[in-house]
Structures are given as C-alpha cells and as structure tokens.
C-alpha cells in the first residue's frame, strides 16, 4: 500500500482536491503506513510536496506523517522539497501551492534547520522572499525555546 499512497500523491493531473483527499483517507484507514518509504527513503509526503498538492500534504499530516523525515539518498526533508523553485514535471506555475505547503509543513512542526547530505538547510535553497521570511520566523522561534 505505500506505493498506492505515493501513486495518489504523484498524479500529474490530480483529480479535484477533495477526491484526492478521499482516496488517501480510504488507503490510510485501510492500513496504509503514512510514513512508509521506498528504497530511497522517500515518503508519500515527499511526493505530495514535490507534486505541489496541498490537499494531499494536509491529509498526510493529519494522519501522522513525519514532516522531518529525510530521504536516504539526499537527506532532504519535505520542507527542502517545498522551497525549491521546481517541483515535479508539470507543476510549473504552482508557486502559490508551494507557499501553502510550506505553511502547512511549518505549522506541523517541520524544522527549517535540518541540513541535508550537502549540509544545506531549506533556507539555503529558498528564493521566494515570503518563504524565506516564514523560515526565518520559525527558526527564531525554535531557538527561543
């Protein structure tokens, strides 16, 4: 079932968001592991972020997805993927979706200080000034605790 979750999150032309959400919930209620990974340590959440699907991201978070899970190959978290300028092929022009996803991940506890295998945090990749500001605010709050 992990691949089924990923398949729903990787649709190039996803169905309406509510339909995608219902499909994910059905799989999760049937026992799919929300944090299952493929051979590269990539979760359904990583895929949902890459394919710029806020509805899928929100649903997976609601069902306990680990927002700080790192990929085995690159060490990237879902937040790393969210702030990069390019998503998956076919997701061009979805900047607003990327911003919404960053907000969802941060609200769920994504740590903007986590470095990938290249030693870079999400803030090292972000180009959008609003995203940069959100990451900086979260980093300051984390350090203040």
For every predicted segment, state its role.
Residues 1-40:
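N-terminal segments that cap or nucleate solenoid repeat domains
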Residues 25-33, 58-66, 103-111, 137-142:
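Ankyrin repeat domain, specifically the short helix-to-loop turn at the C-terminus of the second helix
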Residues 34-37, 67-71, 112-115:
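Ankyrin repeat boundary signal
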């Amino acid at each position: 079932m992990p691949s089924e979750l990923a398949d729903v999150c990787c649709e190039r032309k996803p169905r309406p968001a509510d339909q995608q959400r219902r499909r994910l919930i059905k799989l999760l209620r049937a026992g799919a592991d929300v944090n299952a990974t493929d051979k590269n340590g990539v979760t359904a959440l990583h895929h949902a972020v890459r394919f710029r699907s806020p509805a899928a991201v929100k649903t997976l978070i609601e069902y306990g997805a680990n927002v700080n899970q790192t990929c085995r190959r690159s060490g990237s978290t879902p937040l790393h993927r969210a702030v990069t300028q390019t998503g998956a092929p076919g997701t061009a022009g979805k900047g607003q979706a990327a911003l919404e996803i960053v907000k969802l991940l941060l609200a769920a506890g994504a740590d903007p200080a986590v470095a990938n295998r290249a030693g870079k945090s999400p803030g090292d990749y972000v180009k959008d000034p609003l995203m940069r500001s959100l990451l900086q605010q979260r980093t300051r709050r984390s350090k203040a605790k």
